[in-house]
Amino acid sequence: PMALCEPCQGIQRNWRKAPGHAELVQRGNRKEDRDTGPVTITRYVCDRCGTAWEYENDKSNQKAGWSVVGR
């Protein structure tokens, strides 16, 4: 598998409100239940390197945010 491209390497993981980058293409979202209530998880794929990301939007968890989910 190829490495993360430079813009993907620059994404701060697991931090609320950290920005993505311009070449991420949204691929839909889903709801999941957490102890504090439902959260929205949005899936993205990088146009440049093909990395699949998810962004978890949880207002009560500062450490929810970007994570790599596949290639």
Language-model region placement:
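Short recognition patches in nucleic-acid-associated and regulatory proteins
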Residues: 2-37
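Small disulfide-bonded, cysteine-rich extracellular recognition modules and tandem repeats
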Residues: 8-11, 56, 69
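Short metal-binding segments enriched for Cys and/or His
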Residues: 33-62
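A short, surface-exposed interaction/processing loop segment used at functional sites
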Residues: 62-71
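Short, structured interface segments that constitute the first stable element of a domain
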Residues: 1-2, 42
